[in-house]
Amino acid sequence: MKKEKILLYVVLFPVFFQIITYYGFQSSYYNYRDEVRPTEWYYKGIYGYRLLSREIVDMMTLFLERIFTHDFPLREYAMKKGTPYYHSLFLFNTFFAVLTSLMVNSILKRKEYFPEINEKMRLGIVFFLAAISGFSQYVIVHYDNSAIFLLLLGFYFTLNYYRNRQFRDLIILSFVILISTLNRETSCLNISFLAALFFAEIPKSKEGFLNAVKVLFLPVLAFLLPYFVLRLIIPQNAGDEYYFFESITLKYNLTGINQIAGWLFGLLLLKFVYFYALPENRKSITRFLVISLPYILMIFLVGILWEIRLFVPLIYSAVMLAFLKMEKPYFATISQKPYFQKYK
């Protein structure tokens, strides 16, 4: 793909979607534009564990506040459009929106995995996913776009490991999952993606099953370690706002009109991906969704499903699986080798 096409369709599309979302529309969901600092709930309950991107945005906010004390050509215009914190959210999320589109393009252009994806299809998928991400940001948070980028980065190294059986790819994938877990629990979907590939055929032998467990061991450990360490060092207290057991939203999600509309929209998007998926890949998407049931159940249990951003990671994952072509399932040809050796 020529550089000008990457600039126009892969970089500028997400930038314009972000500009339209943040400055063309004002969310009726919450008055983000006038927020001077992150609201208190980002430091409490389950939100308090998503600290990586929050700390970066806090530092960006302090930096912009210093800049706003000086005169510069766009200062008056920028102050009318939002606070330094709001502009920090825009810059941070736009940066990762661009990286996400670049990563989607980078993955889909690999012919060894996506031989049936041509340039026009690839650009169309980049456009579709960028539009869905931008559209979902009537709820603006600091961790969604970065979480999607890290999820895709994990997919990249998952595919590398699936094909080459190089232990270094598994190590890098596990490191990405560890970092991603400090940002948002979406990182667990990397494990679901890996498992969906490696369990393309259920291993018939005990040894084959143990090999599968070995493959998943490091990524699962990379998720569980930061997940539980964060909960040990940042405990939740009963009575606090957004305390896990006091913020169950399941009944609300099943009865509220907006919430029903939210999860029906998510189901419609998944149905849309199924419609365009290669027929032989629909089972892989279903397998991924079944393995991802803990994530899906959790967003129904404590999420607010009117926030369709909760379904976006599932959509990205399903799209990657929809067009993926691998030569042979792993367990169809595996000889009983340690999982850290290159498969030949």
Protein language model annotation of sequence segments:
Residues F135-L153, N183, L310-L314:
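Multi-pass, polyprenyl lipid-linked donor-dependent membrane glycosyltransferases
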Residues N105-L108, E112, N118-F135:
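Transmembrane and membrane-interface helices of multi-pass
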Residues M103, S146-N164, D169-I172, A318-L321:
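Specific aromatic-rich, kink-prone transmembrane helix
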Residues M79, T83, H87-F114:
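Transmembrane-helix motifs of polytopic, lipid-linked glycan transferases
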Residues D169-E185, N190-A196, L221:
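Membrane-interface alpha helices of multi-pass inner-membrane proteins
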Residues I19-Y22, P203-P279, S284, P313:
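Membrane-lumen/periplasm interface segments of specific transmembrane helices
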Residues I20-R37, K44-I56, M60, I67-P73, ...:
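Extracytoplasmic catalytic/substrate-binding loops of multi-pass membrane glycan-assembly enzymes
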Residues M1-Q18:
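Start-transfer (signal-anchor) and selected internal transmembrane alpha helices
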